[in-house]
Amino acid sequence: MLIRVGYDIRFETDRPTPMLALLSLHPSRHHDLRTPHRIVASPDIPMFEYADSFGNVVSRFTLPPGGLDLSCDFVVEDSGEPDPVVSDAAQHAVEDLPEDVLVYLLASRY
Protein backbone atom coordinates (compact mmCIF):
# COMPACT_ATOMS: atom_id res chain seq x y z
CA MET A 1 0.00 0.00 0.00
CA LEU A 2 1.08 3.59 -0.54
CA ILE A 3 1.10 5.86 2.50
CA ARG A 4 1.28 9.63 2.23
CA VAL A 5 3.30 11.08 5.10
CA GLY A 6 3.78 14.72 5.93
CA TYR A 7 3.78 17.51 8.45
CA ASP A 8 3.66 21.28 8.82
CA ILE A 9 5.22 22.54 12.05
CA ARG A 10 5.65 26.15 13.19
CA PHE A 11 8.12 27.27 15.86
CA GLU A 12 8.17 30.78 17.31
CA THR A 13 10.98 32.26 19.37
CA ASP A 14 12.29 35.68 20.32
CA ARG A 15 15.99 34.73 20.06
CA PRO A 16 18.16 32.35 18.04
CA THR A 17 17.52 28.85 19.39
CA PRO A 18 19.67 25.80 18.52
CA MET A 19 17.53 22.77 17.80
CA LEU A 20 17.74 19.06 17.00
CA ALA A 21 14.76 17.48 15.23
CA LEU A 22 14.07 13.84 14.41
CA LEU A 23 11.56 14.30 11.59
CA SER A 24 12.96 12.09 8.83
CA LEU A 25 12.18 8.63 7.57
CA HIS A 26 14.57 6.02 8.98
CA PRO A 27 17.28 5.18 6.41
CA SER A 28 16.28 1.50 6.50
CA ARG A 29 13.06 2.53 4.71
CA HIS A 30 14.60 4.77 2.02
CA HIS A 31 14.22 2.01 -0.59
CA ASP A 32 10.45 2.21 0.02
CA LEU A 33 10.20 5.91 -0.88
CA ARG A 34 8.05 6.55 -3.95
CA THR A 35 8.48 10.34 -3.92
CA PRO A 36 11.40 12.43 -2.64
CA HIS A 37 11.74 13.06 1.09
CA ARG A 38 12.88 16.63 1.72
CA ILE A 39 12.39 18.87 4.73
CA VAL A 40 11.54 22.42 3.66
CA ALA A 41 12.29 25.33 6.01
CA SER A 42 10.71 28.77 5.66
CA PRO A 43 12.55 31.04 5.88
CA ASP A 44 15.33 29.04 4.28
CA ILE A 45 18.02 28.30 6.89
CA PRO A 46 21.14 26.12 6.98
CA MET A 47 20.21 22.63 8.12
CA PHE A 48 22.66 19.80 8.73
CA GLU A 49 21.96 16.10 9.21
CA TYR A 50 23.74 13.36 11.13
CA ALA A 51 22.88 9.83 12.24
CA ASP A 52 22.37 9.18 15.95
CA SER A 53 23.49 6.00 17.70
CA PHE A 54 20.27 4.23 16.61
CA GLY A 55 20.65 5.19 12.94
CA ASN A 56 17.94 7.87 13.06
CA VAL A 57 18.46 10.97 10.92
CA VAL A 58 18.79 14.06 13.13
CA SER A 59 18.35 17.54 11.62
CA ARG A 60 20.43 20.22 13.33
CA PHE A 61 19.66 23.92 12.86
CA THR A 62 19.16 27.22 14.66
CA LEU A 63 15.68 28.72 14.84
CA PRO A 64 15.81 32.37 13.79
CA PRO A 65 14.14 35.04 15.93
CA GLY A 66 10.50 35.34 14.95
CA GLY A 67 9.58 31.96 13.63
CA LEU A 68 10.26 29.01 11.40
CA ASP A 69 7.99 26.70 9.45
CA LEU A 70 9.12 23.14 8.70
CA SER A 71 7.24 20.96 6.26
CA CYS A 72 7.68 17.66 4.50
CA ASP A 73 5.45 15.58 2.25
CA PHE A 74 6.30 12.20 0.73
CA VAL A 75 4.89 8.80 -0.21
CA VAL A 76 6.27 5.52 1.10
CA GLU A 77 5.28 1.99 0.14
CA ASP A 78 4.52 -0.49 2.93
CA SER A 79 3.05 -3.97 3.09
CA GLY A 80 0.53 -2.86 5.71
CA GLU A 81 1.36 -5.93 7.76
CA PRO A 82 1.79 -5.40 11.52
CA ASP A 83 5.21 -5.90 13.05
CA PRO A 84 5.75 -9.51 14.11
CA VAL A 85 4.78 -10.32 17.69
CA VAL A 86 6.60 -12.96 19.71
CA SER A 87 3.70 -14.47 21.63
CA ASP A 88 5.93 -16.42 24.01
CA ALA A 89 8.27 -13.50 24.84
CA ALA A 90 9.06 -13.32 28.55
CA GLN A 91 8.50 -10.24 30.71
CA HIS A 92 11.48 -9.44 32.94
CA ALA A 93 11.66 -7.33 36.07
CA VAL A 94 13.79 -4.20 35.57
CA GLU A 95 16.27 -5.35 38.21
CA ASP A 96 16.89 -8.54 36.20
CA LEU A 97 17.72 -6.81 32.92
CA PRO A 98 21.30 -6.95 31.63
CA GLU A 99 23.23 -3.69 31.81
CA ASP A 100 23.61 -3.37 28.03
CA VAL A 101 19.84 -2.85 27.57
CA LEU A 102 19.39 -0.22 30.30
CA VAL A 103 20.28 2.58 27.87
CA TYR A 104 16.88 1.98 26.22
CA LEU A 105 15.12 2.82 29.50
CA LEU A 106 16.78 6.21 30.00
CA ALA A 107 14.62 9.29 29.64
CA SER A 108 15.32 11.76 26.86
CA ARG A 109 16.94 15.04 27.83
CA TYR A 110 14.18 16.85 25.93
Where are these regions (language model features)?
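Intrinsically disordered, low-complexity N-terminal segments that are enriched in acidic
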Residues: M1-E81
